[in-house]
Design a protein with these regions (language model features):
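Conserved beta3-strand ATP-binding lysine motif
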Residues: 189-191
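Conserved beta3 strand of the Hanks-type protein kinase catalytic N-lobe
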Residues: 178-179, 322
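Helix-rich C-lobe and terminal helical cap/extension of kinase-like folds
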Residues: 86, 90, 117, 227, ...
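ATP-dependent phospho-/nucleotidyl transfer catalytic cores
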Residues: 129-136, 148, 196-204, 211-318, ...
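Residues on conserved beta-strands of the protein kinase catalytic domain
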Residues: 172, 184, 271-272, 338
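N-terminal accessory/targeting segments that precede structured cores
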Residues: 1-174, 182-184, 194-224, 428, ...
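Long, charged, glycine-rich C-terminal linkers/tails
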Residues: 154-167, 252-273, 460-466
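Hydrophobic residue at the +6 position relative to the catalytic HRD Asp in the kinase catalytic loop
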Residues: 325-329
């Protein structure tokens, strides 16, 4: 019997053309302003935006047809359906990769944003992860006009020199090296003059396209993606807020001897211009540079994980874009290197109750406490998907005995469980989780990618997260200004010292349980045991233990310095 002719449903056809036409026209009218002296430039930008929108519509329409036609008639839980779905995912990801490369700008940032979403199909994340946010720099005449508009017509008098050749150019801004009258080297981040208009145009198009897909396929609940992305890029356009974020992060790590955060020069900072202290360095995953300066990549990776573990579990204030280009390694300083943290445009402040619950979740994951993991998953809203939290964060199943790895049998069980999950399960899971959880997932995915490139053990992440989760669970959130006042801070300091001591004991207890869990005869598990043994007795040896205990007693001076 010949196959039935394929009739593309009318709902699919009308949805794509009606909603995307609405997206383009509304974006056009929203940005029209014929009375502006720059009306001609705006008109050209709008035409360019419509061309970009047309490419996006074409890519989405082709993808919808591909999914509809390729999966038609296949039983949802069959091996053929899964195999075909993977093929369609890959074709669609490659289609969107071409779209992002053609449209550049915010489409590249959107592709990178999607690639960092850990729970999306791997075909999308692996394909789109190749995107690079690099563009050809604008002529300095254009940049000079932005500087004059923001810093005044005589802005050049504030500098000894400004290098007209940018040291970096991305989709939103480019950066120039300069020297102040005082001799201080600075980096000037200058926003492109047309970028805000383009952002509104592109994000509006992305939102309407996502609405189109949600209408066609109600089971795919990914409308949160463009909304989250739009909020993220919108915050990136406010350089004043970026400066405030930078200062708050610097305050949080004021006692850290390894982390460097550029100082902000407020008298030369506006919404479109950010002037900051200039640092040199190389990307954190540049292994050739680390070898050249004689620094062990494992030490660098550990410092990176400690930095972000403290952000997540203790401060609850997280840098939202920790890709290697935003974290430089600079020679000198403690242990022979320092970490320079750049680009503070996007931060996430965690709800305090969520932060405490997430600390407990990580403790439960480390201890393989399945009951507590399921209970906390229910609190987060994961429901039946709570059993997959260990897979997401530790790469083990809810039934795994050890957090350091899985047996061959457990791997087979996990493989079968994951086979039963459908694409709509992923979208339902992501929609049900709180925004704080999604933010941590994204940051954690970027960090894991970096340490994987550095070729260091994933146990560094596991142990570091566990250490700070335990501390963050017990550590009281102290107001830094209150702590700086003499006499009034004594109670808080004593309480913090006691809780720090208790958390140290609990951390050692968890480490020992992980160590015992890795105590068996297989070569791979013996290797895990040796690594953990080294971590416990070499990294946290007797001298360091005394240091920790002394730190607990004298936390008054470490956390709450008197003025």
């Amino acid at each position: 019997m010949p196959p039935k002719p394929f009739n593309f449903p009318a709902k699919r056809t009308t949805a794509i053309f009606l909603l995307t036409t609405t997206a383009a026209s509304s974006a056009f009218t929203a940005n029209s302003d014929d009375s502006s002296p720059h009306a001609a430039d705006k008109f050209r930008a709008q035409i360019h935006g419509i061309v970009r929108t047309a490419r996006a519509v074409s890519a989405v329409a082709s993808t919808v047809v591909d999914y509809e036609f390729s999966l038609r008639g296949l039983p949802k839980h069959s091996d053929q359906y899964r195999k075909t779905s993977s093929q369609v995912h890959l074709r669609s990801a490659e289609r969107f990769l071409k779209l992002c490369e053609a449209n550049k700008g915010f489409y590249v940032k959107a592709g990178q944003f999607i690639a960092s979403q850990k729970v999306l199909p791997t075909e999308y994340s692996s394909t789109l992860s190749s995107l690079q946010d690099q563009v050809a720099p604008l002529p300095f005449k254009v940049i000079e006009k932005v500087l004059k508009d923001n810093l005044g017509p005589d802005f050049s008098k504030k500098f000894l020199s400004i290098d007209e050749r940018p040291i970096g150019a991305a989709s939103i801004a480019q950066v120039h090296h300069a020297v102040l009258k005082s001799g201080q080297e600075v980096a000037i981040k200058v926003q492109y003059p047309w970028i805000e208009q383009q952002m509104h145009f592109d994000t509006r198009t992305m939102y309407f396209l996502s609405k189109t897909i949600a209408w066609i396929y109600p089971q795919y609940r990914f409308e949160w993606l463009p909304l989250t992305f739009a909020k993220t890029v919108s915050s990136e356009l406010d350089f004043v807020q970026e400066g405030r974020n930078s200062e708050r992060a610097a305050e949080n790590f004021r006692n850290n001897k390894i982390v460097r955060i550029p100082h902000i020069f407020w008298e030369m900072t506006t919404r479109q211009v950010l002037t900051m202290q200039y640092y040199t360095g190389h990307k954190i995953d540049d292994l050739d540079f680390l070898s050249e300066i004689g620094v062990n990549p494992e030490k660098v990776a550990k410092s990176l994980m400690e930095l972000f573990a403290e952000m997540i579990f203790v401060h609850g204030y997280i840098h939202g874009d920790p890709h290697p280009g935003n974290i430089l390694v600079s020679p000198g300083g403690r242990n022979g290197f320092s970490l320079v943290l750049l680009d503070h445009a996007v931060y996430r402040e965690l709800d305090e109750e969520f932060r405490k619950d997430f600390c407990q979740l990580w403790e439960a994951l480390a201890l393989k406490d399945s009951k507590k993991t399921m209970w906390l998953g229910e609190r987060f809203g994961a429901g039946k998907y709570s059993r997959y939290l260990p897979i997401i964060f530790t790469g083990t199943t809810i039934e795994s005995k050890y957090s350091s790895g899985m047996s061959i049998k457990e791997k087979e069980i996990m493989k079968q469980e994951l086979k039963s999950l459908m694409f709509e399960d992923l979208s339902l899971f992501m929609e049900s989780m709180p925004p704080d959880f999604i933010a941590i997932l994204r940051v954690d995915a970027l960090l894991r990618s970096t340490i994987r490139k550095m070729d260091v053990s994933r146990l560094i992440r596991l142990l570091t997260y566990t250490k700070y989760a335990v501390y963050g669970h017990f550590h009281p959130k102290l107001d830094s200004e209150l702590c700086k006042r003499p006499k009034t801070n004594f109670y808080f300091a004593v309480k913090a010292a006691f809780l720090s001591f208790i958390s140290t004991l609990k951390y050692f207890h968890i480490l020992i349980k992980i160590l015992i869990g890795a105590n068996n005869s297989t070569p791979w598990q013996q290797k895990v045991k040796n690594l953990l043994h080294n971590y416990l007795y070499r990294k946290i040896g007797s001298s360091d233990l005394w240091s920790i205990l002394v730190h607990s007693v004298f936390l008054l001076f470490c956390i709450c310095p008197a003025t």
